[in-house]
């Protein structure tokens, strides 16, 4: 089951009603998204062995909040959505959509915001990025989108991705279309941009009990039914793992068919869980899953595999 973005003027009234029943997509709600993430990261940093890094990630998330409002994006995506719909592609496909200079403008603004807060190696990294040429930055962005993580040092990747993510989230927030569910493949990827999820969440409120995967780039969430592998869509060999007990707010769903796992966060167990923050703060669970022989099917925007310089 895949999800395709349908332009507003191509939706009939019956399709609009169907889409309203179970929203296949939840476009990013940028108001307070980054502040909420930063607050959750700081909260989780208390008594966590990764506390220093969680506080570092909180600084980046807060900077994203500031830059979001200082550098708004104005863009008409109507033509792009129509073209992508005709091609059956995500409208903001990371492998197709040309990047304009706005994302590098966001990166420089993030660096300016973060500089007073950084010291030591972290400060050296952002100063290095500040001096990089336009082409060098584009090459790093292309490498990350191609999953060529060895070409971008793991200390630079979070800053590059923070700017790219903010840019893509701004674009996703402007999409003037609706979405509907269609049978197809590759629902393990974001239907808006084609990137990977960071984690999934069983929500409360108007989407009570529904599971949504959260994009690690454009911040869109998309519906995937529960008790089905989000990576291969099989359901016969799923297992659920937690570090605490069966009522834990964070679990890992593993699949013996494809050998991967993805974390599930349960808002009903802990209303404050946040897709990126709680995933990052629970790396002990990742270590356990690796010991069990499973590979992670997602990437956290603050923790990329790569080669340090």
From Swiss-Prot:
Family annotation (SUPFAM superfamilies): FdhE-like
GO MF annotations in UniProt: ferric iron binding
Pfam families the record matches: FdhE_C, FdhE_central, FdhE_N
Family: Belongs to the FdhE family.
Record's function text: Necessary for formate dehydrogenase activity.
NCBIfam families in the cross-refs: FdhE (TIGR01562), PRK03564.1 (NF002925)
Protein name: Protein FdhE
Organism the protein comes from: Escherichia coli O139:H28 (strain E24377A / ETEC)
